[in-house]
Amino acid sequence: MTERTESQKSGLSTRIISSVSGFLEAIVTLLPADAGGRIGPIAPRDGNYCPALRRALPDAPSIPIRFIEGPPWIAPGQDGRVVVEIEDGALDCAGFASGVELELVEGKRVVGILTVLRLWREAMVG
């Protein structure tokens, strides 16, 4: 019998973003569990919470992200200031401007809202 990891139990996959093209500083607001949000809190500083972002439009593409900084815990129904990594190539199609609100999704379920405060583009070193 194999032991399941916490990410397998929750239905989330932990993925490594191999090529990062930018970072977002943002306010994330998690929906309460009774409004369809997560049951448990997230730990932004751990670097293993990897949901996706998308615009609130029909058929909008999902953009993989990874939380890398923020408060120790953010529980459902709470908010916090965070920094997330954005997968390479997603910056060109997303239009991350200050004040833009994006859905935070796990699979197909919306679990929160992310409000962009600032975008940093990674410098290429060669």
Regions found by a protein language model. Name each.
Residues 2-126:
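C-terminal effector/interaction modules appended to NTPase cores
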